[in-house]
């Protein structure tokens, strides 16, 4: 099943982060924070402005993005946990 987000929303798959500290200590599941970066799987058509025009989104499918720990709404699609969030929830795009 595919999701087509509406307007200025994007679908993101979380990218799992390291479960080990820099000193080599393994963190238990209860001490780990939710990953705050992910890959954009789909984007909406853009933000609808007050004058009715649509502004294209800055993020594109395939971008690796950073977002706040509590950003977006979690949904399950075909057994996979995804996030749907507004583009404004994205803090930045990882490049390189």
UniProtKB/Swiss-Prot annotation:
Subcellular location: Cytoplasm
InterPro entries from the UniProt entry: Chaperonin_GroES (IPR020818), Chaperonin_GroES_sf (IPR037124), Chaprnonin_Cpn10_CS (IPR018369), GroES-like_sf (IPR011032)
SUPFAM superfamilies assigned to the protein according to its UniProt record, in alphabetical order: GroES-like
A GO MF term: protein folding chaperone
UniProt superkingdom: Bacteria
KW Cytoplasm (keyword) present: yes
Gene Ontology CC annotation, any one: cytoplasm
Key word Oxidoreductase present: no
Biological process, per Gene Ontology: chaperone cofactor-dependent protein refolding
Main location: cytoplasm
Residue ranges, annotated region (Disordered): 26-48
Disulfide bridge map: none
Keywords: Chaperone, Cytoplasm
Coiled coil: none
Database matches in Gene3D superfamilies: GroES chaperonin (2.30.33.40)
Function: Together with the chaperonin GroEL, plays an essential role in assisting protein folding. The GroEL-GroES system forms a nano-cage that allows encapsulation of the non-native substrate proteins and provides a physical environment optimized to promote and accelerate protein folding. GroES binds to the apical surface of the GroEL ring, thereby capping the opening of the GroEL channel.
Family of this protein: Belongs to the GroES chaperonin family.
Subunit structure: Heptamer of 7 subunits arranged in a ring. Interacts with the chaperonin GroEL.
Protein name per UniProt: Co-chaperonin GroES
Protein species of origin: Psychrobacter arcticus (strain DSM 17307 / VKM B-2377 / 273-4)
């Amino acid at each position: 099943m595919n999701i087509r987000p509406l307007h200025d929303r994007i679908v993101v798959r979380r990218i799992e982060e390291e479960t080990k500290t820099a000193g080599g200590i393994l963190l238990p599941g209860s001490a780990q924070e939710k990953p705050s970066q992910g890959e954009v799987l789909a984007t909406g058509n853009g933000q609808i402005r007050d004058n009715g025009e649509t502004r294209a989104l800055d993020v594109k499918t395939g971008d690796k993005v950073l977002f706040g720990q509590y950003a977006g709404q979690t949904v399950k699609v075909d057994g996979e946990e995804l996030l749907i969030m507004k583009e404004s929830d994205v803090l930045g795009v990882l490049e390189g």
